[in-house]
């Protein structure tokens, strides 16, 4: 039985839910209905105040950064917004000296391809990427093998908190412990965790936690974000600072003085409209509380998983909800055909080659929608 059904009162806040059976928040969270009004606020300030709008825009970008940071337990002033995670990964790479004896990044073959592409290039800087294969089932990381790969040559350890293909919720604690034993930094990619799994970056003990807003946060494109632990931020010196990454951007001083803390990662002119667009969804999640979101998510994904198994479908996600994020990956057979037919029938899900169809009931979805998508899969396979 689903819990926190009172959250369904928020369905009108997400217009796409009235137009389709939307079960794809793992790939693009539903837009909040207040987003157009917030964007109108942004354009009104520009139209009425011109350059003076920066007096409102700049603090608003920082406020929104603090709101999204709070959703992963980050203290105020420790999170920065940028356009994408790719930008932020590049900045982190530029902060590190890859020319010494400590020149390795340890990561997993199950990471997001964009991240693996970045790590594959550190050899150009004198570094080495150690890519540890996942477990043979392709569902989970091989944590023991990753821990064994971390040694005094390791500069950085990077892994996802929730794996994008299979929704595996990774226990990062052994990686953090081992990395810090040998003096390495730890960066966790929380893109598939934030907004659906309770996260406390301080308790995790990570040095950097990176993510974006396209998925369960429902913040839309253009809102990558980075938390940097205060004890390491002053030692990190990104090559690309832009004018917002310096101590006094409006002094226009040609001599570089890094901004304190995480602000040095702010880069150039911020994506003000993206921050305005994301704010309503962030604020809604802050009001609800991620713990309640998680409880509702599990109350929907567990019946989804169990019913899929009962129908004879292959499930490529952990069966234990404590080890799973917000989506379930299902291969009913003929996955590409089933996926395409689901879309034709008004179900929005997505397909990942080699694993199956990803389905993610978020807090705004109903138990009936979960049952309906499985019934539709069965109907497609039966030729109905």
Regions found by a protein language model. Give the residues of each.
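Pyridoxal 5′-phosphate
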Residues: 1-384
């Amino acid at each position: 039985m689903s819990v926190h059904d009172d959250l369904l009162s928020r369905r009108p806040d997400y217009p796409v839910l009235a137009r389709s059976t939307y079960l794809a928040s793992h790939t693009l969270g539903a837009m909040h209905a207040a987003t157009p009004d917030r964007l109108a606020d942004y354009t009104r300030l520009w139209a009425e105040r011109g350059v003076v709008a920066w007096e409102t825009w700049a603090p608003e970008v920082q406020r929104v950064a603090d709101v999204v940071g709070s959703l992963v337990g980050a203290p105020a002033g420790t999170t920065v917004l940028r356009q994408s995670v790719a930008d932020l990964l590049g900045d982190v790479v530029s902060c590190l000296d890859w020319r010494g004896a400590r020149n390795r990044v340890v990561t997993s073959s199950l990471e997001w391809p964009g991240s693996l592409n970045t790590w594959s290039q550190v050899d150009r800087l004198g570094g080495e990427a150690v890519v540890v294969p996942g477990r043979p089932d392709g569902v989970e990381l091989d944590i023991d093998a990753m821990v064994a790969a971390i040694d005094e040559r390791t500069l950085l350890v990077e892994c996802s908190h929730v794996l994008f293909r299979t929704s595996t919720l990774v226990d990062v604690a052994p990686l953090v412990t081992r990395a810090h034993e040998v003096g390495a930094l730890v960066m966790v990619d929380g893109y598939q965790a934030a907004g659906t799994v309770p996260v406390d970056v301080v308790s995790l003990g990570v040095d950097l936690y990176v993510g974006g807003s396209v998925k369960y946060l429902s913040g839309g494109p253009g809102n990558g974000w980075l938390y940097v632990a205060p004890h390491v931020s002053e030692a990190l010196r990104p090559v690309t600072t832009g004018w917002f990454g310096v101590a006094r951007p409006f002094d226009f001083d040609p001599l570089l003085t890094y901004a304190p803390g995480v602000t040095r990662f702010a880069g150039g002119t911020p994506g003000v409209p993206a921050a305005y667009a994301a704010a309503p969804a962030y604020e809604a999640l802050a009001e609800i509380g991620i713990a309640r979101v998680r409880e509702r998510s599990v109350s929907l994904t567990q019946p989804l998983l169990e019913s899929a198994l009962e129908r004879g479908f292959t499930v490529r996600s952990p069966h234990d909800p404590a080890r799973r994020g917000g989506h379930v990956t299902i291969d009913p057979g003929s996955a590409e055909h089933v996926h395409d037919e689901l879309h034709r029938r008004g179900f929005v899900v997505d397909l990942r080659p080699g694993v199956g169809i990803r389905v993610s009931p978020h807090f705004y979805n109903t138990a009936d929608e979960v049952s309906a998508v499985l019934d539709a899969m069965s109907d497609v396979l039966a030729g109905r």
